[in-house]
């Protein structure tokens, strides 16, 4: 019993460390995403102010085109961040399921 128990205990510790690391990564990515959203919001207003200031000038069309390109890239980055967060959450759930399976095995082992 002790050998099996020790193996299960080691696996559980290793998985717990992985879970903690995944949680930390997800938290950090979520922080970066919030910062990016704040940056995006302020940049959007600045771009609009610049475009309004250029109305009637020959640069207005170029600014509008550039703003649309930048908005596309920012949306793409936002989606990439969201995909990253989703994949980290899936990995966390997988690790939690593995830990739960070990709990079950340990309980079964203790009843022998």
In which residue ranges do the predicted regions lie?
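Charge-rich amphipathic alpha-helical interaction elements
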Residues: 1-112
């Amino acid at each position: 019993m002790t050998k099996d128990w020790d193996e299960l205990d080691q696996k559980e510790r290793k998985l717990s460390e992985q879970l903690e690391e995944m949680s930390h990564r997800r938290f950090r990515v979520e922080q970066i995403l919030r910062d990016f959203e704040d940056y995006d919001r302020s940049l959007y207003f600045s771009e609009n102010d610049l475009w309004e200031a250029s109305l009637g000038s020959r640069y207005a069309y170029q600014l509008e085109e550039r703003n649309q390109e930048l908005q596309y890239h920012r949306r793409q980055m936002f989606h990439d961040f969201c995909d990253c967060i989703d994949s980290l959450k899936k990995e966390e759930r997988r690790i939690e399921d593995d830990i739960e399976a070990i709990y079950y095995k340990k309980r079964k082992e203790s009843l022998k």
